[in-house]
């Protein structure tokens, strides 16, 4: 027989409730204005690249669900010492990816899709390892979906191409602000 834990039960209920409500209103509870603006631009890029509104909505919804669930796990103190160390390494890798994306956006002729895709793949693998024992396989698939979508070399090449200059500029502005404020 499993021991009863009201904290565990409350956490399960919170995650279940949040998974049903991962829309704009809930996102604003966990995601600030700058992050929201970056997510909106990522949605526009995905929509233009895939020519599919539902596909773009799905990837951003999955991203929000994952971000909210990881935030809930972190705030609830569910991560042990080794997981917190992994979370710190994940954050550093994410920051490295953001700085690389900024560098590619600011310095002409430096963009390499393989470098950015590699960083995103490393982030995906670290996040999957971090939440392995805390989230369901469905959430693991969401993580794969989000990172695989944004690490697609075709999408990255399009993002750094002439047709997406405006979107890239807004994404870079948001990433720079998030890095400066320590929110990434």
Swiss-Prot record:
Predominant location: cytoplasm
Name of a matching Pfam family: DUF758
Post-translational changes noted in the entry: Ubiquitinated in a BTRC-depdent manner; leading to degradation mediated through the proteasome pathway.
BP term (GO), one: innate immune response
GO cellular component terms, A-Z: lysosome; nucleus
Cell location: Cytoplasm; Nucleus; Lysosome
Keywords: Cytoplasm, Immunity, Innate immunity, Lysosome, Nucleus, Ubl conjugation
UniProt xrefs under InterPro entries: TNFAIP8-like, TNFAIP8_sf
Subunit composition and interactions: May interact with CASP8; however, such result is unclear since could not reproduce the interaction with CASP8. Interacts with RAC1.
Free-text note on domains in this protein's UniProt record: The central region was initially thought to constitute a DED (death effector) domain. However, 3D-structure data reveal a previously uncharacterized fold that is different from the predicted fold of a DED (death effector) domain. It consists of a large, hydrophobic central cavity that is poised for cofactor binding.
Family of this protein: Belongs to the TNFAIP8 family. TNFAIP8L2 subfamily.
Role description: Acts as a negative regulator of innate and adaptive immunity by maintaining immune homeostasis. Plays a regulatory role in the Toll-like signaling pathway by determining the strength of LPS-induced signaling and gene expression. Inhibits TCR-mediated T-cell activation and negatively regulate T-cell function to prevent hyperresponsiveness. Also inhibits autolysosome formation via negatively modulating MTOR activation by interacting with RAC1 and promoting the disassociation of the RAC1-MTOR complex.
Record-given protein name: Tumor necrosis factor alpha-induced protein 8-like protein 2
